[in-house]
């Protein structure tokens, strides 16, 4: 039977995910169009923050699967690829931070945040993030699950 369900055009976003327990998977997230955004697609950050427990993904063997948000530790994408967001022109602060995960692993990178009046402390910055905090690592952008962060040093 032919597929008669109309589907929206999506943009593939290649990612490497690390799951609780240490397994790594190369996957593809499918980003919906968003003409209101500069890059024309919904940023991966917004997809990860949506109120859903499972994410549909493409797998390396061309099959499909579902990833549990609760099992995600990190989601890593190309910093110049689809799924990223342009940096605001003004009011952006860059800080070198180290995230100490509950597993004992450390992730060091650049935290980009927008200064909000009255919210200048690092605790304010981290409390403003949702389920994931984006950290720049050279040419990569890593979304780290905030539930997996034990402490932050800067």
Q: Model regions: which residues?
A:
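Conserved RNA-binding domains used in RNP assembly and mRNA/RNA metabolism
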Residues: 1-154
